[in-house]
Every structure is written in C-alpha cells, then in structure tokens.
A protein has these predicted regions:
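Conserved, single-site charged/polar hotspot
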Residues: 1-41, 45-551
Length: 551
C-alpha cells in the first residue's frame, strides 16, 4: 500500500536523521522525493537539512530548501535554515530578507529581532526596499465605475494578526481626478488637481499631521481628522510609500482605492480609514482571496459569500469607527489596481445576492471532509471520522475524485501538508507567554467531533501553557505557518525533552464555509454559483436584495 510504504520510508529517514546518519537519511528520502507528491516539501527540507552535514553536498542544500518553499510557501523550517546558510555565507541581503520574514511571523522573538536589526543596519536606510512590497508611482485603474450600495469603513494597513490598523508616520497620496481636503470643522481647506502628489507627514513637535505638496512645502496642518474626497465617483486614489516605526507591523505595499480617505491624527502618528461602497470594494476583496480560481461560477459564489460577510459586519457594528481592516482573516484588500475583468464581472453578475442564516466562511483548500461535515468526494473512507482516527486520516492520501485536487500534481500543500519543527522554536514562543523551560509534552484538550484541534496543552520543565484558539496554536507550533487546525503531532524525544515535532495536516483555515478549490472543481463539473453555494451552505437561505426574493 503506497500510503504505508511512504510512511515507513519517512519513518526510516527521520530515524537516520535524528541519529545524525545523514547519508542514510538522504538515501531513504530519495524514494519520497520522486514518488510521493504529498510530502515533497517536507522531503525537500529534510534533504536540504541533511545535505548541510554531508561532505561535498552542502552546495545542494539551498536548492532543496528553495524547492521546499516552491511546493509549500508556509515551510517555516526551510526559511529558517536558508537564513542560517545566508548568514554563514555572509550574504547580507539574503540574511536580511530571510530573517525579516521570520521576524514578521514572530515579532516578539528577541533573537530574530536582533538578527534583523543587525542586517538592517548594514543595508542602511533603504532596507525596506528589499522587502516584497508592491510599489506604484501613479494610479493604474484610474477610472472605475461606481455601484450604488451600502458604505463600508475599512482601516488601512491592518496590523498582522490583529484587528487594529498600524500608526503611520508618513504616507503619499495621488488622485486620478480632482479632489478636496475636507476638515471636519472648517470644511474644504485645500483643492488638489488630478495626479498631483501630496505628502502627509506626522510632526512630533506639534503632534499634528502636515499636508505637503510635492516639493515638501506645508499647505495645511491638522490635529483633528480630515478627509480626502474625490470629486468624481469613478476616480481613484493611490496610497503609497507608507512609513511606520516598525517595518514589520503591517504590509506596507502601495494600494489604489475608491471612495474617500479619512486621516486621523493621534499621538505618535496617524491612521487611515477608507469609506467606500461595498460593491466597489468587493472586486478587490475577490482579487485577494481568489488565488488561482478562474472558473466564473466559482468566482460568483465567492463574491456572494464575501458580500454576505461584509454586509454582516456593517449591519452588526453600524457606528464603529471602522468595520474591517485590509488585513483581516476573512477580508484582505491589496488595492483595486489588482482587479481583473473576470472579478468585476463576478461581482456585477451576482450583485444583490447574499446569504442568510449562515456563517459566511471562506477557506482556500479542502480535504475529503470539511469542519461542517461537508464532503468533497464520493469515496467513502475505511474508517469513521473521529478524534481517535485523526492519525489515520492524516496518513491517508486524498481520493482520486477529490473536487479540490490541484491542477499541478506536485502542488498538494494546501490539501495535505507536513512540517518539521524544531522544539527550540516552540520553546522560544512559549517563553513569550510564561515561564516554560524545555518542551516535555503536547496534548490536545479539546477537538471537534471529527478531530479538529481547538485547544492544546504544552507541558514544559518549568510550567505549562494552554493555547485556547486555533490561531494561537498555529503561532506557538509554527509561528502561524500551520495551514489549519486539522492535524496530528508526532514528537521525537531526547531523554525527557522533545527534540523535534513532525506535524501532518489537511486543508486550510478552520475548514468551514466555502472551499475555494472545491468551488473551482464543482464549477468544472457544471454547477452554477447558486448550486455551489447550496453545496457548501446546505442550510442557508439566499436573498436577492433587488427583488426581495428568498430561495
């Protein structure tokens, strides 16, 4: 049986690897590397980690590690080892990029902070130019028709893993049409022509935000909120070159938006709130979540789910300063500059349709079983889905008729994934929470009926800690890199202490709601977007707000 042969080969390889017999480990891994597409990222990492210690093979290590990331960009261990190798080879730029990536995932880690600061200093003032941020000089979309719909307030530059926006020290704005600056008490204080650059800079001496022209001359200074208002609904505003005290607090990419932009001065800087019509925002939210989904009916289904969740946020908190951030778990906004025609069409053709009586969840990839017991296959497993059988599920390969199977047979990491984690990394993250010591045991305290982990207890030599949410579990185990809460853990001990962890898992997110790749597969089978929604939300009612009809 292929599944058990692969598992046995992996077990042999891990045994040799832990015994530091790296040549034999590499030999055992060769079978998996060529025969098992479901474990290729893990296999490539272990081959790279072994190559470091094999005489004459060290040059192959970065090749294998890059392959590990190509097949699974969440492979934290591969980035960590690449950082170490870049440092050893005295490659300042690569060291900075890899350590910056790790630091962004684990911002409270003092060791990573020191490494990042060291290489940032060596690179100089423009270190941020070497991060993977989108940069734009002028609006690209420039002119996009507006659709009448409820307004949404979205905070820009949302902090990673939080529900608050970053405090900015400076930002630049360029509008594709005429605009005005509106003070909440004084009214219009400045008119700005199309494509004229304006700089907003926090002045610590006055605790105000200065509005400057392209030459740096101050035109207006404000201590209270003011708003950039576009005079024409179909024009756009580019927000660029955002600066914060912490480079890693948020994704500081440039982004083009519709609607108005309110600037809120505060101690230490400013925050930005975009007020925009929901249907104008929706195509950009689709762009951030759709990934490689291109089937029109799948995109329409996603549009309905995101619209439903967005309007629910607005209706639940009508008086909130902002309803969402641009970097939340459900909603991500990278700018309307990334919208392509199919996304506009998906939003327009599903306009007015929303879900009732259903949680509007979305997740990228699904295995045979979702958290809500929705199946993505007609193949019946030889066991019952339960916490006791979670390990069997993790071992089993996806069925041939899985509706969410990837087009590329080597890119299975979203459906089935596996990570090697150094226990020292887990101990470092736990030490941020409590006095912990060495990792001794890991125990799931609460699971769902089919085995998803909800709470997890970590026992250390100096104390213990209970992670209370899937998000916290993912951070403590893998700095947020675990793809879902459907996994099992194999600990490897050295004496009383855990040395390393092998984590095997299925699907992404919490496994509830619309599975994007599943929707893609169902669309290819001929289901329209309403059929896809009924498949993933069988208890939901659909409301057409244009006609008032409920299905």
């Amino acid at each position: 049986d292929f599944e058990y042969v692969s598992s046995a080969k992996l077990g042999s390889a891990v045994s040799f690897y832990l015994a530091k017999d790296y040549k034999k480990a590499a030999e055992a891994l060769q079978y998996l590397y060529t025969a098992d597409p479901y474990s290729i990222s893990l296999t490539a990492y272990l081959l790279g980690a072994s190559a470091v210690h094999i005489k004459g093979s060290a040059r192959l290590a970065p090749v294998f590690l890059q392959q590990a990331l190509e097949h699974d960009s969440n492979n934290y261990a591969a980035v960590k080892l690449l950082a170490s190798l870049a440092e050893k080879n005295k490659n300042t730029l690569q060291s900075w990029q890899y350590y910056a990536t790790l630091h962004a995932l684990d911002p409270q880690n003092e060791r990573l902070a020191q490494k990042t600061a060291r290489y940032q200093k060596e690179l100089g003032a423009k270190a941020e130019d070497y991060l993977y941020y989108l940069r734009l000089e002028t609006p690209i979309a420039a002119r996009v028709e507006s659709v009448e719909s409820p307004t949404v307030r979205m905070a820009l530059y949302g902090l990673r893993g939080q529900t608050a926006p970053a405090v900015l020290q400076a930002v630049k704005l360029v509008a594709s049409g005429p605009a005005r600056v509106q003070d909440e008490k004084l009214g219009t204080v400045k008119n700005v022509s199309a494509f004229q650059l304006r700089q907003l800079v926090y002045n610590p001496q006055t605790n105000a935000v200065d509005i400057m022209d392209g030459k740096g001359q101050v035109e207006f200074s404000a201590k209270r909120p003011f708003t950039f208002v576009l005079e024409q609904d179909d024009r756009t505003l580019l927000v660029r070159d955002a600066q914060t005290q912490d480079l890693f607090a948020a994704d500081l990419s440039d982004k083009e938006l519709k609607g108005s932009l309110t600037v809120i001065p505060q101690a230490g800087g400013m925050t930005l709130i975009n007020t925009v019509r929901a249907e104008d925002l929706l195509p950009a939210l689709l762009a951030a979540r759709a990934q490689d989904v291109r089937e029109e009916e799948a995109l329409r289904a996603l549009a309905v789910v995101l619209r439903s969740a967005l309007l629910a946020e607005v209706e639940t908190n009508p008086q909130a300063a902002y309803h969402i951030t641009d970097n939340g778990e459900v909603f991500k906004f990278n700018g309307i500059n990334l919208v392509f025609p199919k996304l506009l069409e998906a939003a327009r053709q599903s306009a007015g349709v929303r879900l009732l009586n259903a949680a509007s969840g979305v997740y990228a990839d699904c295995g045979p079983l979702g958290a809500d017991t929705i199946t993505n296959t007609q193949t019946k497993p030889a066991y019952v889905f339960s916490p006791a059988n979670a390990a069997k599920y993790m071992l089993a390969n996806p069925p041939a008729d899985l509706v969410s199977k990837p087009q590329d047979s080597t890119q299975w990491s979203g459906v089935k994934w596996a990570y090697w984690i150094d226990a020292k990394d887990v101990e470092e993250r736990l030490s941020q929470k409590t006095k912990f010591g060495r990792l001794r045991a890991i125990e799931p305290l609460k699971r769902t009926a089919n085995g998803r982990v909800l709470t997890l207890r970590f026992t250390g030599s100096k104390g213990e800690y209970v992670a209370q949410t899937p998000q916290e579990i993912s951070f403590l185990l893998g700095a947020g890199s675990l793809r879902s809460n459907f996994f099992d853990v194999a600990p490897f001990y050295k004496g009383k202490n855990i040395r390393a962890l092998l984590i095997r898992g299925y699907d992404t997110g919490l496994g509830a709601g619309l599975c994007l790749q599943g929707a893609q597969g169902l669309a290819k089978q001929g289901l329209n977007y309403l059929g896809i929604i009924k498949y993933y939300f069988p208890e939901a009612r659909l409301l057409d707000t244009k006609t008032g009809k409920i299905n």
